[in-house]
Amino acid sequence: MPPWLAFERRIFVKRDAPEILARALRTGGERYLGLIHGDTILIGSATDPYQPAERRFRVTRRILEVLAEHPGLDIVIITKSPLITRDVDLLTRIARHSHIHVQISLITVDRELARRIEPRSPTPDSRLRALARLREAGIETGVNCMPVLPGITDDPAALDELVRRVAAAGATRIGACALRLDRSARLRYLPFIEQEFPELASRYKASYSHGRNVGEKYREGLTQRFNALRAKYGIGDGDRR
């Protein structure tokens, strides 16, 4: 089974992760807590913590229950799933004595386009509703517009609509960066482009022929565009200060 297919179909549930975390915090005492105080605890950097299996196994929720017992933490959660609203009670509890920030991943608000490029992901509207629900609960929430897909999700009018709706939902910031293609990702992504967006195939091959990043001129232009949109709609960038 190719890696990209295994990523979706072979789900390893770390059932005892909450207990391991609780034991480490309990037995490690101040030494262990000293390692995480002052640093950011990032949940969702490798896989979505609210993927469908979370409904059944509740691993993320139980981890949050453990973290809720320890004040003074800095926690960031990255997800594209509205399932996170299930845990609003815990998030607000944590926010009373720690800093917690949720980042919703969203690269387009076009439902039909989203269906083509993220066919098994929650709809853009459901993510925006989740964002609004978190903000209503007082949770600091932003958006990751990552990756921006050259020629697909970078239309100026589409990006304007994205930032407008993100700001209207109450997001405090939005971060963005262009698509990066490592060799393994290129082997999967370029055939997808040839199938779904054949008119862009030659452009992608040329743009990513010398490395994982699209050209500097494109990246600089994208940064300028998002800076202008942030200013227009009164929303911050992706950096937490």
Question: Model segments located where?
Answer:
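Auxiliary Fe-S-binding modules of radical SAM enzymes
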Residues: 151-241
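Conserved strand-turn element in the central/C-terminal portion of the radical SAM core barrel
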Residues: 77, 109-113, 118-120, 133-155, ...
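Surface-exposed amphipathic alpha-helices with a cationic face
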Residues: 92-95, 131-136, 227, 231
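Conserved Radical SAM active-site core
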Residues: 1-103, 107-115, 124, 128
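Amphipathic alpha-helical segments that form well-ordered structural scaffolds
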Residues: 20, 66, 133, 221, ...
